[in-house]
Every structure is written in C-alpha cells, then in structure tokens.
Amino acid sequence: MKNFNGKLILIGLMGAGKTTLGRQMAQRLDYRFYDSDHEIAAAAGVPIPTIFEMEGEQGFRSRETAILKKLIVLPHIVLSTGGGAVLKEENRALIRKSGTVVYLHAPPETLLERTRCDNSRPLLQVADPLAKLRELYAARDPVYRQTADFTVESANCRETVQTLLKRLSR
C-alpha cells in the first residue's frame, strides 16, 4: 500500500457506511470530513434527487467531478464519495493519485437494509430496490476493487474504524 498522505478517500455503494465511518475517522484523525454528495447539494442549492430530475445522471456526474476537484486538494481530509463517483475514469484517476482510497464493502442485502427508509436515493426509487442494488454491485464492485488501495468489510462501525486506523499506520 502507498504511504498515507493525510487524505483518506472512501468509496463504495450507497449504504456501505462511507458517511458514518468517514465522520468517525475524521474525528479520530482530527481531520476535516467532507461528503461529496452533501457538497454537491449545497453548491447547487437543491437536494440530489432534484439535480437528477432536472439534469439527469450525467448532469449530476459533471457536478460530482467539479466538487471532487475542489475537495481533493484540501489537506488532512476524510472524503466520502458518492457511490457512482468511480464510474468516470477521470474521477478514478483523480482520487487514486490524491490519497489513500478505501473500498467499504457490504453485500447488496446489507445495503438494502441500511437504505430501506431513505427516500433521497434516486437510483433506488424502483419497484425492486434489491434487484437494483445487485445490478449496481455486479457492475461496480470490480471497479471499486481496482480503484481502492484496499478493501474493508463495513459491518460494525467501531471495528471498521479500528481496522482502518491499523491499516493506515502500517
């Protein structure tokens, strides 16, 4: 693994725990925490589902790249990326060269349990959210693994934080 340079970038599907774990890691490291989805919505002045409605996924992805470019240059950060941030090669290259990238992995069934009551996820507003999560998982899991410096199972938050802290100190 490359040396930890003070930038921790979390990738993974929606519901993997990137935001929850990211906040915990930032607190433990005494770093600033950023959630790219939150930053996109704040910059746009509207929630993400509205961006998807008005601009489609492509418009959202363009905004995502712009926000990643702004955040990635900041020192001592923990950055939680959106689940689809790695879909663009430009984003993958940017995050790979900028920090330590961790794939928070969880199976689709766990992801569904964690996102079941969250109506702010446009990609899950379908008749069969589990089938959609399985489809996203099949398509994205290999990309996450390729992009990440290492993969961590995101089961118990406290244990995952400890695992990450150990990995970063190597």
From Swiss-Prot:
EC number of this enzyme: 2.7.1.71
Catalytic function, reaction form: shikimate + ATP = 3-phosphoshikimate + ADP + H(+)
First-level EC class: transferase
GO molecular function: ATP binding; magnesium ion binding; shikimate kinase activity
Binding site residues for ATP: G15, A16, G17, K18, T19, T20, R121
Residues engaged in binding substrate: D37, R61, G83, R140
Compartments, as annotated in UniProt: Cytoplasm
Binding sites annotated in the UniProt record for Mg(2+): T19
Cofactor: Mg(2+)
Gene Ontology CC: one annotated term: cytosol
Cofactor: binding comment: Binds 1 Mg(2+) ion per subunit.
Main location (coarse class): cytoplasm
InterPro entries: P-loop_NTPase, Shikimate/glucono_kinase, Shikimate_kinase/TSH1, Shikimate_kinase_CS
Keyword list, A-Z: Amino-acid biosynthesis, Aromatic amino acid biosynthesis, ATP-binding, Cytoplasm, Kinase, Magnesium, Metal-binding, Nucleotide-binding, Transferase
Family of this protein: Belongs to the shikimate kinase family.
HAMAP family: Shikimate_kinase
The protein, known as: Shikimate kinase
Annotated gene: aroK
